[in-house]
Amino acid sequence: MTDGDTKEWTFSHSLAKDATWTPGLREIFEYRDLGIKAGTKGDHVAHLIRHKGKKMTDEVQQWHVHDCTFQMVYVMNGWATFEYEGHGQKTIRKGDCINQIPGIAHREIACSDDFEVLEIVSPADFKTRIVDAPKALAAE
C-alpha cells in the first residue's frame, strides 16, 4: 500500500553489528538511530536510548512537553519513574510500554543506570519545551 505521503519513503535495515551510539538530547544518555528518520523522510524517528552512567540534573527533570503527534516508549532494560499531568507518577520497567499522548506535561523523577528504551516519535524533528507545573500540582 502506498500513497502520496509514503511513496518517497525508502527501505532501511539497521544492523546491530554496525550500530553506532551518539550523543543526543540528554547528556546522560546515548542514542542509536535505527534509520527510520531517513527512511520516512522525517515523518517518524525510532531510536534506542540508553543510560551511559552519568549523573546530572537536566531539563527533563523539569516539567516539559514534546511538540509531536505520536510518542511511544518501550522499556528494553532497567526502569524509570515519570510524573504525568493528570496521571501522577508512573514507574516503567523492562517490558513496559507507554503511549505518551501529544502535549502531555511530564517530568522524569529518576531512572536506573541500566535504563534503555526504544522510542518512536512523529514527526522526527519534534521540539521539547519547558512548561510550568500543572495547575493541580502547583496548588498542592
Locate the predicted segments by residue.
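Short beta-strand segments in beta-sandwich/barrel cores
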Residues: M56, G78-E83, C97
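Hydrophobic/aromatic beta-strand elements that line small-molecule binding cavities or substrate pockets
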Residues: L48-R50, D96, H106
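Double-stranded beta-helix
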Residues: T2-L15, R107-E140
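Short acidic-glycine-tyrosine-enriched beta hairpin
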Residues: G86-G103
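Conserved catalytic-core motifs of eukaryotic protein kinase domains, centered on the activation segment
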Residues: E85-H87, A110-C111
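Active-site donor-binding loop signature of nucleotide-sugar glycosyltransferases
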Residues: I36, H51, K94, P102, ...
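Short, conserved beta-strand element in jelly-roll/cupin
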Residues: L48-H51, V65-F82, I120-P123
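A short glycine-rich, His/Asp/Glu-containing loop-to-beta-strand
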Residues: T20-W63, T69
